[in-house]
Amino acid sequence: ETILIVAAILALISCFIVPPDADYKSYIHASTISQLICLMIVVCGFQRIGVFRIIGSRLLEKVSTMRGLVITLVALTFFSAMFITNDVALVTFVPFAVAVLIMAGQEDKTILVVTLMTIGANVGSMLTPIGNAHNLYLKALTGMPTMEFLGIMAPYSGTAAVLLVIVISVVFGGKPV
C-alpha cells in the first residue's frame, strides 16, 4: 500500500512538471503492461495451487545451509535474467524466494535475500543483449555482433557474480537452513 500511495503522489507531482496533453496516451505501452499482468497472474496462480510449496520443499531437501539456499535463489535470477530480462526474473522468482524463506523459517532474511537476488538479476542481465532494454539499445546503436557483446560484458558479469558469491558466503556462512 505504501509504495502504491507514494507512486501515485509522485505521478501527480510529475503532472505539474510535464503538464498532461494528448501525448500522454502514447506513453502507455498496453502490450507490455498486459504481458506483465499476465505474468503476475501466472505467478500468483502457481503460488495458490502450491507449485512454489512443492518446488520449495524439494529445494529445501537438497540444500543444507543458508549459503546454499541463497546462492541457489540468487543464481535463479542471475541466469534467468540473461534471457528473460532482470525485471521479469524478479517478478517471477521473488515470490518463490519469499515462500521458500517462510518455509525454512528464515523470513527475517527476506529483505537481504531479495536485495541479493536483485543484484544477481542485474549482474546476469548485463551479460546478454536481451538481458535488459539498455543492452538491446546499445547493440542496435553500435551494430555490434552478439559474440563481441558477450566478450566485452563477460568479464564484468563474471567478476560481479564471483563477488556476489563471496558476499553470500561471508554473510550466511555454513548456517543450517
Please give the residue ranges for each predicted region.
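Interfacial loop-to-helix junctions that mark the boundaries of transmembrane helices
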Residues: 2, 21-32, 146-156
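Hydrophobic alpha-helical transmembrane segments
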Residues: 5-6, 33-34, 67-75, 89, ...
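Membrane-embedded alpha-helical segments in integral membrane proteins
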Residues: 10-21, 132-142
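Membrane-embedded alpha-helical segments and adjacent helix-loop junctions characteristic
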Residues: 19, 23-107
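Juxtamembrane and boundary regions of transmembrane helices in multi-pass small-molecule transporters
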Residues: 108-111, 115, 147-177
